[in-house]
A protein has these predicted regions:
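Bacterial N-terminal signal peptides
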Residues: 8-17
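Bacterial N-terminal signal peptides that target proteins for export
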Residues: 1-9
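Core of compact, soluble alpha-helical bundle domains
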Residues: 23-176
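N-terminal targeting/docking segments
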Residues: 3, 20-23
Length: 176
């Protein structure tokens, strides 16, 4: 009887060890809760992006945000697909026949994004993460990943940059 108990304990300890190893290897996609959780945050973020007056001061962004009414739903889908793929989920971000789904470098030059506009988007992203109670570790990784795209997206370096500060759980997050 003791041998069976000891063997069971060893099996449980081994499984617990493998479980903690597996969780240490979870992708950001898995830690965020998968496609539906990402879609929920992206839905909120895109709604905030489309009504932001600072972003809509850029004529190219305003034309997109206030032009074709289907562009918002399409952008939500494309952003979700991109985030899913970039965080280690399924490879679902694909180019389409309309020219969407390209790399960030190919898809943003015509928007003439400034550092300030990039900072506004980062601030809105951070607020979205807080809105949906994304963990601090995941927020750090998401914000670092987003910042890594600045040099690819920002082409208008003449505009003044905007730096915001948000705090959560005593941790200060700076968007720049």
């Amino acid at each position: 009887m003791f041998k069976n108990y000891a063997a069971s304990v060893l099996v449980l300890l081994a499984l617990a060890g493998f479980s903690s190893v597996a969780s240490a290897e979870d992708s950001l996609y898995q830690r965020l809760g998968g496609t539906y959780a990402i879609a929920q945050v992206d839905d909120y973020l895109v709604d905030m992006i489309y009504i932001n007056k600072g972003l809509n001061a850029n004529p190219a962004l305003s034309a997109i945000h206030n032009g074709n009414p289907t562009s918002k739903a399409g952008f939500k889908q494309m952003l979700t697909n991109w985030v899913v793929q970039e965080t280690g989920g399924p490879k679902i971000y694909q180019p389409d026949s309309f020219g969407r789904g390209k790399s960030l470098k190919e898809s943003h030059p015509h928007l003439n994004i400034s550092d300030r506009e990039f900072d506004i988007i980062k601030t809105l992203a951070l607020a979205s993460f807080y809105q949906y109670n994304v963990g601090n570790h995941e927020i750090d990784q998401l914000m670092d990943d987003l910042e890594s795209y600045r040099k690819v997206i920002v082409l208008n370096t003449k505009a003044e940059a905007f730096t915001s500060r948000l705090k959560k759980d005593g941790v200060e997050y700076r968007t720049k």
